[in-house]
């Protein structure tokens, strides 16, 4: 009997060993649950790869790991992501962005009126909920959920193209401050895009998972999330694999767009000093914005960057002599000058000009100049950091780990400001643009039971928690 049991045990062991060895050579199963970071300025999608334990962030058709959270409506079609961004200056009244600021949120009339003044598109109050007015062949209203659904549908299709199979399940992240209504509205947007949301995870928790802190021996974790339009600071307490958001603070009007605007205003002054005139064509203003963004990114790794952009200026207003060969009549221009005067259009053309001058505007921007232009904005980052420490009854020396999230935390001076405040370097081991989507994808893998199994992050609800905003 004992001999039979030994033989049986050996056979079972052999089968298990054979299965394990065979598993090494079999193709890994395709992940079926995606992780989504639906950000205010950019959004992205990723998957947890069974077997390797790695996360794959899925790129769009042009190789971008994230897409702008922008939807533009025209008479011909609806353009999402980078296609929508291309229309932001030529079709501003029908190009919707920052929809995440409005989703599921109830506004007073005064609050919504104040928010609306910041945007070129029209926002209407529907019993406290925001709706966007769009005019193409006809005028109609779209909800923030509808805008979110368009973005999520784009991400869903990107994942399907990459994985070669239909996708219907996802895990999604939301700001820790989102209440039940905002979370349900985000889920509704996903449902409209054909996605069943299996779990909603807070963005700071997702970021902590991306940094592997759900498996690390740390207790107090500070997450600084600085993106294109918002700053969020969260203090997390970690106990085992459980996360409790202990305090939140931030600035909903501070981000990379504000840093860009400071540089744009500087260039506005430079152009006026050099030529006495400013560009008025929407297409060229859009190119100038793109050049500013490129310079900002360049300055994260270089001490200086050259901005070079071709502009068309009204000849009548020029104060600088230019060769006659550069003067072009307005009949050769494909687009009429904009008549609108504001910082977005950088121009004031009271009448259609007869002649225009094509100039190549070129200037070198140093990192030192960029830091000087934004010095006060960079220092504002410390205000919510100090607030969460105060609310969490913590000394800054008691923070075990500082993690950075969001593309704007790439800026060297921002990292220095945070490092000088805490007296130690923040953790920058994860791409800040992809930290949240990486964490959400890990959580999607856990929900799907993917091997190798990770330690799941369990969030402890803190219903009494409120975010302190410094706008």
Language model features with spans:
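Oxyanion-binding/catalytic loops of NTP- or PPi-dependent enzymes
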Residues: 2-114, 122-125, 137-141, 145, ...
């Amino acid at each position: 009997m004992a001999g039979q049991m030994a033989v049986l045990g050996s056979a079972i062991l052999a089968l298990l060993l054979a299965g394990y060895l065979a598993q090494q050579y079999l193709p890994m199963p395709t992940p079926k649950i995606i992780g989504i970071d639906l950000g205010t300025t950019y959004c992205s999608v990723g998957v947890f790869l069974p077997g390797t334990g790695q996360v794959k962030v899925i790129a769009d058709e042009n190789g971008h790991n994230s897409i702008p959270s922008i939807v533009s409506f025209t008479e011909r079609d609806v353009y999402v992501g980078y296609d929508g961004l291309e229309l932001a200056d030529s079709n501003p009244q029908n190009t919707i962005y920052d929809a995440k600021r409005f989703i599921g949120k109830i506004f007073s009339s005064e609050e919504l009126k104040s928010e609306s003044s910041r945007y070129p598109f029209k926002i209407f109050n529907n019993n406290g909920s925001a709706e966007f007015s769009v005019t193409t062949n006809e005028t109609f209203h779209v909800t923030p959920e509808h805008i979110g659904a368009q973005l999520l549908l784009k991400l869903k299709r990107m994942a399907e193209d990459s994985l070669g199979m239909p996708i219907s399940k996802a895990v999604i992240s939301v700001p820790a401050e989102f209440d039940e209504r905002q979370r349900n509205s985000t889920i509704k947007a996903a449902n409209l895009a054909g996605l069943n949301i299996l779990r909603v995870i807070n963005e700071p928790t997702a970021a902590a998972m991306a940094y592997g802190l759900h498996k690390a021996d740390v207790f107090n974790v500070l997450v600084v999330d600085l993106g294109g339009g918002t700053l969020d600071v969260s203090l997390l307490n970690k106990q085992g694999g459980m996360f409790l958001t202990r305090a939140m603070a931030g600035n909903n009007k501070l981000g990379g767009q504000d840093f860009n605007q400071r540089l744009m205003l500087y260039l506005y002054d430079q152009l006026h000093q050099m030529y006495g005139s400013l560009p008025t064509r929407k297409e060229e203003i859009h190119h100038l914005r793109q050049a500013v963004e490129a310079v900002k990114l360049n300055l994260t790794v270089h001490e200086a960057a050259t901005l070079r952009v071709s502009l068309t200026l009204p000849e009548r207003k020029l104060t600088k002599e230019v060769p006659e060969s550069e003067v072009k009549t307005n009949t050769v221009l494909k687009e009429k000058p904009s008549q609108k005067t504001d910082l977005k259009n950088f121009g004031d053309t009271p009448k259609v000009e007869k002649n225009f001058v094509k100039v190549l505007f070129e200037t070198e921007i140093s990192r030192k100049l960029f830091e000087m232009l934004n010095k006060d904005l960079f220092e504002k980052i410390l205000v919510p950091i100090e607030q969460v420490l105060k609310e969490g009854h913590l000394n800054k020396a008691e923070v075990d780990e500082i993690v950075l999230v969001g593309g704007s935390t790439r800026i060297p001076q921002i990292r220095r400001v945070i490092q000088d405040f805490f007296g130690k370097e923040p953790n920058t081991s994860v791409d800040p643009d992809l930290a949240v989507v990486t964490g959400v994808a890990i959580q999607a893998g856990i929900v799907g039971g993917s091997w190798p199994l990770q330690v799941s992050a369990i969030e402890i609800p803190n219903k009494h928690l409120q975010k302190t905003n410094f706008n």
